[in-house]
Amino acid sequence: MSVKLGPAGVPLSCKGRTIVEGMDDIISLGLETMEVQTVRLVSPQHFEQYWQAGVLANKTNFEMNLHGPYYSELLGDKLQRNRSLAKVEAALQTAKTINARHITLHVGHYAETGRGHEANEQVASVFNGIVQRINDIWNDDDEMYPVFPWLSEGTPSKIGIETSGRQELWGSLEEVLEVVNHVEGTIPVLNLAHIHARGHGRLRTSEDYGELFDQVRETIGTKEFYCHFSGVEHRMGNAMHYTQIKKSDLNFEPLAEFIIEEGSWLDMTLISDSPLLEHDAMYMLQNIEKARHKQLERKAREERRKALAAQTSMSTEELQAREAEIAAARAKDALANMEKKVEEKAPAEEPKPKAKETKKQDEKDSNDDLFEVDEDDDDLF
């Protein structure tokens, strides 16, 4: 099992804002990957820092990834499609410069084609062209190898097709899997917040995640997964906006449990899309470690039961039931002791002392009566 975690962009805690400085911070946190955001437009002046990041990634075996233009209309009319493909071209060139292993792309609205086989065929045709283009860029010029050594040592970036989070956008899980299954060189980008929202909150247990990953594996026969994770606010099958993980009904603990208990076959890159970026990436890493410790504790208990069963006439099931009885009895005793301590600590109610009346106080009261007038409290304000 291999799980790499990282943020979508330069960490919030990074003092510098360049990609290389962001990589340094990510590595120092114990994370292993990042996704560079080029969701709107790639400017030529950025290519120097992109190349520096690519060199560093190549030397340190750090996994770089790239998110292409957010606003795409690959199912639109000819003008819309050409504009979108021009942005994609810039992203592909950046991916080469930065040594990106995965490029995440969006499709956009269904447009006039609507849902169905025709739309999927058109998307497949577009992505066939994109895959061919990244291969051409990667093998463009042998003389470039000294500058980009990863071109000769590695393979072209994989083109990722992201699941969408809204009903009017192409990109349901089934649509993405159908296209990926027919276009070599593409992979599904499983945005788990989008899948959860589009499925009206479908990802709640480790079994739900197991069904999802099994569906992908059975459909396209892959063990490699590129995923986005974040909290999400959703309504009526549509993602409204990302939230931090702890403030969402999309919990990470069930996914961590699935990864540790059932995901030994996974090769996963997990990107934090949360507004907290690296903080939630670290939160995910901590939850995976907790799940791993729970698994080790469970296995240790099972081994202990087997050893006891071999020494006694009891079966492992009987020993487990006995352990449950002892644990329940201890919990009951602990609750009783706690209630007893609370009762002992409760202070007895002390009688209130009677006020002493003095001659001076009587005189003061009589003086107050001289100036007493009836007033409504509301009139004071």
What is the predicted role of each segment?
Residues 1-93, 187, 294-337, 341-344, ...:
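N-terminal pre-domain/capping segments
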Residues 16, 75, 114-117, 170-173, ...:
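Gly/Pro-rich active-site loop or hairpin
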